């Protein structure tokens, strides 16, 4: 977690002590490439030698690291371009190319990052380098190419759980929630105490229409994650939804009470209305739930509305009977879709979450059609001016 969040300096050295004898399995277990690793049992001299080697490699990269730590990515990239030519060993070259690729990827320089990862793979076939290419495809909305490469990674390095997460995300983007859940469950079996992955699996089970299974994963996430820095209201909101859909009234009320003490401030008013609606839906109080969703719908144009918050709203609306008095599901979901939809994958994902409601699916498609027509008209006007 410290490594992925950047919570300690790039100049720090991370050495894994492990019983694994395959470098790829070490990398897979760590989900990112360590600076070095040493096998158990080992002597103090062996550890000293490995540490000395790791510090030598870090000193070689220090000029680039310092620029990155000062926020000067441009100078860091120029420095790394020079260091590639100065590398005297394959290991030094691989270290520079890895840092250069990660920097380009963070800056969304996808072509440059892709060239670096490809050059790394020419030196050595390493799972994290393939993972970098898969992330580039994902960022470019090339879902099929990304998924194909991720499946290759999983076949070659079945313990590389990060690849499972990204593949599951790709499947969910295409509305394939059952398949996404299946992939995540395999990853959880490999790393059963990973808080973030348990949350993702619970969310995926909700999207796949299995609230009982979602509750199991989310309850475990809450048990082991309360002291995790990433712990927050999101996992509790998903757990509330799971209990609501599964009809677990007592547990639903317990989670709702906890959320009422957490969701404070104007920026959380939308979620409070949605959570209240979830609780009322769990009791089948349709009219009261609709009123809460109506209050949430009035806030759909808020700038801070996130994709996940919007999806929670959609999933709650999809549980309302469409024949109750004053039903406005179509209007609400169309307005939501106008806010969230950008690509065809967005349409597939939202329509899959509409729980087979013909009215709501039509609302998503109508919004996408309106956006496409507006875009076509804008392009036409631009061409006319030329």
Task: Report each predicted region and the residues it spans.
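Charged, alpha-helical scaffolding/interaction elements associated with membrane systems
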Residues: 32, 69-70, 107, 174, ...
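Short amphipathic alpha-helix used as the core "switch/output" element in two-component signaling
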Residues: 1-9
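Alpha-helical segment of the N-proximal tetratricopeptide repeat
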Residues: 59-108, 115, 132, 377-385
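Receiver (REC) domain switch/output surface
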Residues: 47-58
